[in-house]
């Protein structure tokens, strides 16, 4: 069963939320982007039962797993 990956990446002085690589939202603060991504990931997992995770860039630009559902 394929899952969904939401990613929070630095962009234009703020943070962009990517949905399977496609940009969907931009936030001025990282925490706002992470909270929105967490709610979206949890809702998707609740709705379709597929695994969903949130990854975010760290200070060096590498991705770290922040949340996982399913």
Question: Where is each model-derived feature located?
Answer:
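Short, mixed-charge low-complexity intrinsically disordered segments
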Residues: 46-70
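Charged, amphipathic alpha-helical segments
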Residues: 2, 29-42
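Short aromatic-glycine-(Arg/Gly/Cys) micro-motifs in beta-strand/loop hairpins
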Residues: 1-23
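A generic structural signal for ordered secondary structure
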Residues: 13-15, 36, 55
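Generic marker of residues within folded, mature protein domains
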Residues: 7, 44-46
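A short, exposed loop/beta-hairpin motif centered on an aromatic-Gly-Thr core
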Residues: 20-32
């Amino acid at each position: 069963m394929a899952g969904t990956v939401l990613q929070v990446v630095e962009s234009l002085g703020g943070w962009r939320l990517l949905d399977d690589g496609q940009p969907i939202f931009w936030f001025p603060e990282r925490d706002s982007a992470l909270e929105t991504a967490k709610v979206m990931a949890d809702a998707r997992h609740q709705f379709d039962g597929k695994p969903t995770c949130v990854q975010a860039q760290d200070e060096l630009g590498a991705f770290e797993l922040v949340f996982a559902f399913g």
